[in-house]
Amino acid sequence: MERVYLDNNATTRLAPEALQAMLPFLTEEFGNPSSLHGQGRAPARALMAARRAVLELIGAEADSEILFTSGGTEADTTAIRSALAADPSRREIVTSTVEHAAVLALCDHLERQEGVTVHRIPVDGDGRLDIEAYRAALSPRVALVSLMWANNETGTVFPVEGLAELAHRAGALFHTDAVQAVGKVPIVLRGTEIDMLSLSAHKFHGPKGVGALWLRKGVPFQPLIRGGRQQRGHRAGTENIPGIVGLGRAAELALGGDHGAVRLLRDRLEQGILARVPKARVLGDPLDRLPNTSCVAFDFAEGEAIVMLLDRAGICVSSGAACASGAMEPSHVIRAMKVPFTAAHGAIRFSLSHWTTAAEIDRLLEVLPPIVDQLRALSPFGAEEVK
């Protein structure tokens, strides 16, 4: 039985074109891009080409900066630490209650260990940011606003361009964790007031272990990793050329992505579930949402059990984010949205890619309803509750 993979917000399959682009730099083109001799020239050229590809994917000015990192977590950490170092008189950060752990865990540490005040803006039942609470949190004491472009669990998209404008009025820098958005929705940074953006290659069919932090031209910056002068002194250490090349090729491929086709399959999935499974609800903004992401909560069914039973049937999904999976409590995102208790424990994330097929969606729709029925029959609430 061929496996159906519907967990693309956790990671994606490496594009064959990205792999082929990487292979020479794992073999004959092994040179250090900082070397002056001939062996370093091809890696140096590849580094520049990848930088241009990423800038094009995110619609950024050619003279802005791309800082290659080990992934989204390092990019987020670098942005937050740099903003705090840029103006020591500002010791406050504004973020949201539904950010990825890469941002929230660092903010928790800064608050507990370094005396930074963190404002965590709430969201409504669809995962939309409370704009009035956001406005109220902004002040001349805020060094940085860090808000995600799109949520990794529900797919809800934040209006980051307008949020960045409000941050600048208070004199704060604006960073967006766009790890789940890049490659899935069109992004044009040119002309916006966004200062920094994080991305990760493995979320759009590039390799794991490589990401990037985009910096708007003129943004004050302090490096997280010091040492050599690689990447204009912004990140020390010999660059991961094979990974960066794979990131660049994945960026080129993502520019031609058909988001509309993925959206149609996601809608087919949601409509099919709602038609076949009573007491199911789609979580997230009904309109402003990633085209590949569907978070569905099933009343009176345990999400972890749904995941395990689907896995036995050869279908890969997740309950909440993979980074938070394993806990029996609903994720912090689901809790922040105040999803009712009976549904919160049954939240499942389905995330598609351009490789997802209609046949795979139909396979899920065949297998899922009896699994939910089976689990509800075991529920202490009883199967009668869902009728």
Swiss-Prot record:
Give the transmembrane ranges.
none
The biological process GO terms on file are:
amino acid metabolic process; nitrogen fixation
Answer yes or no on keyword Iron: yes
Sites bearing N6-(pyridoxal phosphate)lysine, chain numbering: K203
Q: Which cofactor does it need?
A: pyridoxal 5'-phosphate
Signal peptide as annotated in the record: none
**Single annotated GO MF:** cysteine desulfurase activity
Question: What's the catalysed reaction?
Answer: (sulfur carrier)-H + L-cysteine = (sulfur carrier)-SH + L-alanine
- A Pfam family this protein belongs to? Aminotran_5
Source superkingdom: Bacteria
Q: What is the disulfide pattern of this chain?
A: none
Q: Where does pyridoxal 5'-phosphate bind?
A: G72, T73, N152, Q180, S200, A201, H202, T238
Annotated binding of [2Fe-2S] cluster, by residue: C323
- Per the UniProt entry, the Enzyme Commission number(s) are 2.8.1.7
What are the catalytic residues?
C323
State the UniProt keywords alphabetically.
Answer: Iron, Iron-sulfur, Metal-binding, Nitrogen fixation, Pyridoxal phosphate, Transferase
Describe the task this protein carries out: Catalyzes the removal of elemental sulfur atoms from cysteine to produce alanine. Seems to participate in the biosynthesis of the nitrogenase metalloclusters by providing the inorganic sulfur required for the Fe-S core formation.
Q: Subunit comment for this entry?
A: Homodimer.
Family stated for the protein in its record = Belongs to the class-V pyridoxal-phosphate-dependent aminotransferase family. NifS/IscS subfamily.
What is the protein name stated in its UniProt record? Cysteine desulfurase
Q: Which organism is it from?
A: Cereibacter sphaeroides
